[in-house]
């Protein structure tokens, strides 16, 4: 592959800088040269991405040299996090920019640098030599999607490469389209909506769907059975996760100190809130499915977020009746505690004190202090609902758990605590 002039290298970096991919200070730092060695033949990224068995590269195991512009960078152990991506993404110079129906090969490639490898700055054009592989390896993976990557053994800077451009995307790519766009820059267009935030505080992901409404559970709309299965399949085709640029579990170790990617006080990411993309993302498979990956790690660096989130919590609807019914998830309110169960351990807080029972018969608070804290918050919240009837979820049934004989023991205790706060006789429970 022959790149152009040095002036084009600077132009390419400036283009990436304008897209928000490259800090302005990097845009002019493109003067190093990495000339190809005599006899060296560069393999186009699209050839490396040619599909062989399954969705794996046909060149798995081969040692190749290729040229590409760095579009995303994920240094090892950034911000002290352990499970970082440890590499960078490159894309064929001058590629992208338009959606091409019928595309069969990607022009993007993930370069694995390991924990101590060099991570070039985004916007840099590089010549990389390494071994082609899949992550996870075909023999080890238990999922249908893997990431084609190049395990780098040498890297040099090339001058004169035209910057790649993000491809506009108004919907979630189909599986075949995603394979042909793997590791390439996309620029999602229009409004997207948060349809799931269950793993946001653990793995930093938000599940999005194009349009202005979240996806609904199948049996909210259709009858159980084949119709529901078909509906869920259609939902799956319209959903994609926005990742945070790391594989770190944010609920463990020092990662608990890292700022969340898409959550902040006063700026929630509720289901139904709208998302607009302000920066390109990389489309890549992680943990068995394709995701939108930011071009830099957002965990610990929320200012790098590629999206803005807007929304307003809907108010209570106006109805004709005067009886107010509410539902409340008490999140494993167990009056039987982990500390009282032989052999039970717990999940620790930042001080190391066990807060929640871990893999025990009981599933709630571990200590009396933790239970008192949980109970106080539940009591305050329920009494503030102004409800006449409250249906509870995740409250202990000691008989089912195998630690007691009174099915309603925890329910009775909670009602007692509610009445102590609201006044005797305010609440009663249905046995």
What are these regions (language model features)?
Residues 10, 34-36, 403:
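Intrinsically disordered, low-complexity serine/threonine-rich segments
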Residues 18, 332, 397:
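Active-site micro-motifs of SAM-dependent methyltransferase domains
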Residues 171, 362-363, 374, 399:
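Flexible glycine/proline-enriched surface loops and loop-helix/loop-strand junctions
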Residues 354-372:
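Conserved SGNH/GDSL esterase-like catalytic core that processes O-acyl groups on lipids
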Residues 368-431:
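Active-site surface patch of divalent metal-dependent phosphodiester/phosphate bond hydrolases
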């Amino acid at each position: 592959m022959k790149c152009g002039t040095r002036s084009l290298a600077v132009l390419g970096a400036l283009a990436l800088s304008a897209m928000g991919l490259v800090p302005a200070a990097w845009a002019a730092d493109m003067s190093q040269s990495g000339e190809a060695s005599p006899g060296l033949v560069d393999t186009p990224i699209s050839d490396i991405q040619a599909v062989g068995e399954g969705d794996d590269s046909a060149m798995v195991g081969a040692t190749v040299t290729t040229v590409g512009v760095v579009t995303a960078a994920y240094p090892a152990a950034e911000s002290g996090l352990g499970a970082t991506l440890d590499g960078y993404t490159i894309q064929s110079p001058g590629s992208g920019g338009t959606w091409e129906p019928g595309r069969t090969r990607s022009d993007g490639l993930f370069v694995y640098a390991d924990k101590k490898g060099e991570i070039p700055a985004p916007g840099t054009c590089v010549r990389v030599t390494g071994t082609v592989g899949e992550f996870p390896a075909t023999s080890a993976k238990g999922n249908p999607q893997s990431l084609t990557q190049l395990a780098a053994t040498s890297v040099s800077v090339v001058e004169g490469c035209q910057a790649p451009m993000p491809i506009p995307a108004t919907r979630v790519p189909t599986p075949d389209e995603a394979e042909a766009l793997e590791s390439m820059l996309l620029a999602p267009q229009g409004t997207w909506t948060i349809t799931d935030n269950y793993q946001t505080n653990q793995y930093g992901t938000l599940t999005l769907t194009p349009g202005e409404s979240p996806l609904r559970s199948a049996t909210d709309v259709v009858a159980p059975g084949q119709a529901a299965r078909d509906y869920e399949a259609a939902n799956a085709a319209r959903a994609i996760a926005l990742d945070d640029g790391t594989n770190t579990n944010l609920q463990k170790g020092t990662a608990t100190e890292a700022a969340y990617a898409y959550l902040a006080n006063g700026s929630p990411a509720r289901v139904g809130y709208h998302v607009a993309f302000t920066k390109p993302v990389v489309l890549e498979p992680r943990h068995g499915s394709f995701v939108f990956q930011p071009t830099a790690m957002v965990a610990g660096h929320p200012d790098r977020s590629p999206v803005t989130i807007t929304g307003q919590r809907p108010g209570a609807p106006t109805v004709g009746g005067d009886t107010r019914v509410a539902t409340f998830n008490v999140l494993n309110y167990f009056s039987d505690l982990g500390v009282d169960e032989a052999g039970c351990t717990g999940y620790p807080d930042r001080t190391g004190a066990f807060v929640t029972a871990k893999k025990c018969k009981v599933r709630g608070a571990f200590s009396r202090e933790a239970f008192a804290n949980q109970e106080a918050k539940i009591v305050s919240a329920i009494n503030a609902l102004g409800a006449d009837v409250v249906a509870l979820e995740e409250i202990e049934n000691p008989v089912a758990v195998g630690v007691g004989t009174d099915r309603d023991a925890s329910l009775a205790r909670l009602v007692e605590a509610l009445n102590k706060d609201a006044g005797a006789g305010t609440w009663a429970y249905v046995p």
